[in-house]
Amino acid sequence: MTTRKDKPLNIYHTLVSIIIPVYNGANYMKEAINSALAQTYKNIEIIVVNDGSKDNGETERVALSYGDKIRYFYKENGGCGSALNYGIKNMQGEYFSWLSHDDIYYPNKIEHQVDILNKLDNKDTIIYGGYELIDEKGNSLRYIKPDSVLPINKLNISLLPLLRGLIHGCSLLMPAKYFHEVGIFNEALPTTQDYDLWFKIFRVAPIHFDESILIKSRFHSEQGSKKISNHNEECNVLWSSFLHELTEEEMIKMEGSPYLFLTRTATFLSNNTPYKKACDLANTMAKQVLNDTKISVIIPVYNRINWAIEAIKSVLIQTHKNFEILIIDDGSTDDISELTAICKKDKRIKYFHKKNEGPAAARNLGIKNAIGKYIAFLDSDDLFYKDKIEIQLKFMEENNFIFSHTSYHKINEKGKYIESVHSGLFSGNVFPQVIQTCPIAMPTVMGTLTLFQENLFPENIRSGEDCCLWISIASKNSIGGIDKELSKVRISGGTNTFMDPNKYSVGLINITSYVLNDAYLSKFSPFTINLLLAAVTQLRLLENKNEDYKKSNISFFKNNYVIQKIRTYCFVTKILILLTITSIRQEGIRATISRIQRWLKKHI
């Protein structure tokens, strides 16, 4: 064990004032004063303030027995806050340390905390820690360790430990400057004067958690909070005032978002306190945060106006009412009069017309004009379920995700159910696996406006541009997945058998090119090989299905130009994919990028 002689002298050898307020405390105060006198750090003053005790002079006799070892003051009864204020006004130290008359300091309490100050650049930091809980006779009950409740980094976020009930006033070592800058204890509050003042001070002061247990806190029936009848009501009022006074920035700093802070505060109050009114207020405020959150729904449109109108109507019936719809007309050639008429009827719908440049450019225009906190994408031929935005918004706020997607239903051209796709199981840290398997469907995606402002769709890509962006986002962020079908994705032709192999193959090659052409993503090029190998397998299955169908419809297949074209594209696609795989393996990434571009011009 290191002795005091072995320890270096404190560079910062400041005077610390230990203030002991007492009312009728002759039973315990001697232990408290003795623990203060036993401090290994000697540059201290001990101030005992008798708050008008009515115990036939017992409290005063105990205090006077210490002579000039302590500074003793007597005042008329005014409550704990008034006694502390009296001591503060008479203290000479640069730092304040509160010791309740029924609590006990460990001998190294002050020295240890001053040592911590020596290691910190900012000497205006408040030091605090956990404590040992003891009974009336001084027997240990248990240890209260804040670091078992919150991670260390959160314990150093001003206000958060206080609002999770983790601050014991007697564990603090606090610069006295804050009494001059912020104020002293509110003497009108009999039992909550401490948290009231800590709240005000912690809003402006840095804090530092130390895991050492340095105080013993006595739990007994004579404590003020147990004897004062309106304690719970006083606490309800105090906590409600906290919730009203906190700024959005403070809530974000503590828990990542106002919604998350409010719901976690409600959970804390419900599980750890009887303060029902404050708990109900936190829940009400959390719901209001969701209601006040605007969602920007971006719908690119190119012809198929009847489907686009269906898509718009699926947004208009959302249970979450705070939204805007951005219709991006990507140079439609069909009659759009019915579409524009709907847009003019609802102020929440904004209509933009642009020349045809593809879905990526259309979505980017929507992103640049969006004003919501979150963006949700909806293709003009797809649909939202009515609670889609409500469920996804709550999920993202509760889990602090900046990007999420959900499972979905496939429907045919007439809106009939085909199957469920449980893509929402694809969640968490999905990179680099997302390169070879990206199940994220466009109308299931929601993300923050900031995320998409910083990550626009690649406009030079018209097929596979969505997967390219999802891969890029997943390489830097965790992906939130909801395994609940909240959107309907329309499949042209009603079945995957008739998908466009041309578009499919171009999309795969575009994704491969995008990955290989990115300095960071290209490090994971083997995943593109796996992606293309999987594509070959899928195309082979497609070809087999077509062959089976052809046998039962020989004359139809012989005379159908579209079917013959699909078969040709399937063959060309497999050739291109296999050439890509061979090129990556034999010639490397850069040569493959150049070759891909030549393939696209020659074969597609």
From Swiss-Prot:
Protein name per the record: Uncharacterized glycosyltransferase RC0461
Enzyme class, broadest EC rank: transferase
Protein EC: 2.4.-.-
UniProt similarity note: Belongs to the glycosyltransferase 2 family.
Highest rank taxon of the organism: Bacteria
This protein's UniProt keywords: Glycosyltransferase, Transferase
InterPro entries found in the cross-reference section: Glyco_trans_2-like, Nucleotide-diphossugar_trans
Protein source organism: Rickettsia conorii (strain ATCC VR-613 / Malish 7)
Signal peptide: none
Taxonomic lineage from the root: Bacteria, Pseudomonadati, Pseudomonadota, Alphaproteobacteria, Rickettsiales
Record has Cell inner membrane as a keyword: no
A GO molecular function held by the record: hexosyltransferase activity
